[in-house]
């Protein structure tokens, strides 16, 4: 007798993909964390020191190294993260301001069309 599954299995279909909203290519990139700046610097070193390490192993080794670092060693990465956060906030504010301006212009166009 075949086993009957009681769980509803949802598989993504082509119609599901069509329902997703498109991402705006002009949207600013998110700010990187101090850890991500550290990873950018250290990933190649870890890979050369451990050539047999898998992607997951490299990630684990990076995490271990990050946790072993003291505050002074982390400061350059935290400074980069702070600067990147300021950049992201500034770009996001500009992006939102552009969006509001274009929405107001579109609304004004609609209202002028309605008057005619």
UniProtKB/Swiss-Prot annotation:
PANTHER family, sorted: HIGH MOBILITY GROUP PROTEIN DSP1 (PTHR48112), MITOCHONDRIAL TRANSCRIPTION FACTOR A, ISOFORM B (PTHR48112:SF22)
Lineage, top ranks: Eukaryota, Fungi, Dikarya, Basidiomycota, Agaricomycotina
Designated gene of the protein: NHP6
PROSITE patterns given in the database record: HMG_BOX_2 (PS50118)
SMART domains for the chain: HMG
Originating species: Cryptococcus neoformans var. neoformans serotype D (strain JEC21 / ATCC MYA-565)
Keyword list, A-Z: Chromosome, DNA damage, DNA repair, DNA-binding, Nucleus, Transcription, Transcription regulation
UniProt key word Ribosomal protein: no
Role this protein plays: DNA-binding protein that induces severe bending of DNA. Required for DNA-binding by the FACT complex, a general chromatin factor that acts to reorganize nucleosomes. The FACT complex is involved in multiple processes that require DNA as a template such as mRNA elongation, DNA replication and DNA repair. Also augments the fidelity of transcription by RNA polymerase III independently of any role in the FACT complex.
Family, as annotated: Belongs to the NHP6 family.
Keyword check for DNA damage: yes
Subcellular localization(s) per the UniProt record: Nucleus; Chromosome
GO cellular component: a single term: nucleus
Ranges where the record places region Disordered: 1-32, 68-116
The protein's name: Non-histone chromosomal protein 6
């Amino acid at each position: 007798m075949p086993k009957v599954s009681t769980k509803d299995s949802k598989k993504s279909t082509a119609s599901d993909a069509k329902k997703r909203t498109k991402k705006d290519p002009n949207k600013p990139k998110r700010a990187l964390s101090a850890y991500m700046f550290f990873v950018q610097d250290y990933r190649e070193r870890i890979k050369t020191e451990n050539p047999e390490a898998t992607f997951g192993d490299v990630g684990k080794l990076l995490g271990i190294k990050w946790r072993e670092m003291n505050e002074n060693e982390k400061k350059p990465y935290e400074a980069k993260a702070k600067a990147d956060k300021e950049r992201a906030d500034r770009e996001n504010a500009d992006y939102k301001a552009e969006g509001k301006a274009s929405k107001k212009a579109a609304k004004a166009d609609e209202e002028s069309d309605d008057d005619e």
